[in-house]
Regions:
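ABC-fold ATPase nucleotide-binding domain signature/coupling loops
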Residues: 2, 9, 39-68, 86, ...
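A short, proline-enriched helix->beta-strand linker immediately N-terminal to the Walker B motif
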Residues: 75-79, 108
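Conserved catalytic loops of ABC-family nucleotide-binding domains
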Residues: 104-115, 121
Length: 167
């Protein structure tokens, strides 16, 4: 699981990524960081993967913390991966890169993405729109836009374009 609000330990970046798999080889840690689009900023740190971060990730941006958390989740290689607004603090280019990496994961994975940004959801096989804890809409991005329901209104608000044009 990777969450929007990330908890990092007072440890090295490598130690934070490998928390659930401390005996994991460095190359696998780095591969997970690359998939989470974290490798470039980690290597730019004073000690790279050996840089110590303070508890709760003091000194890192929100997006950097989220990418370390995502790398940690990817390193575990779970069959079910839950991403709770994991890319809320990253730019669109980074989010697109991460989504591509998630699509190309080796093996069979089920990924649940909890998000408010349509860009995080639009390529999902199924999208569930919740309203007061109940499923209000269900379908693909295209189907939900055609329904002209809440999802379509959120799309129009986020993209500043009518849902029928944004497909």
């Amino acid at each position: 699981m990777a969450m929007q609000d990330v908890f990092l330990f007072s440890d090295t970046i490598e130690g934070n990524i490998a928390y659930a798999r401390p005996d994991c080889p460095f190359e696998k840690v780095k591969k997970a960081a690359i998939a989470a689009d974290a490798n470039h900023f980690i290597q730019a740190m004073p000690e790279g993967y050996d840089t110590i971060v303070g508890e709760r990730g003091v000194g890192l941006s929100g997006g950097q913390k989220q990418r370390i958390s995502l790398a940690r989740a990817l390193l575990k290689d779970p069959s079910i991966l839950i991403l709770d607004d994991t890319t809320s603090a990253v730019d669109m280019e980074t989010e697109t890169y991460i989504q591509t990496q998630l699509k190309n994961l080796e093996g069979n994975h089920t990924i649940f993405i909890i998000a408010y940004r349509i860009s995080s959801l639009k390529d999902a096989d199924q999208i569930l729109v919740l309203d007061h804890g109940r499923i209000a809409e269900r379908g693909t991005h295209e189907e939900l836009l055609k329904n002209n329901g809440y999802y379509a209104r959120v799309f129009e608000h986020q993209y500043h374009t009518p849902a029928k044009e944004g497909r």
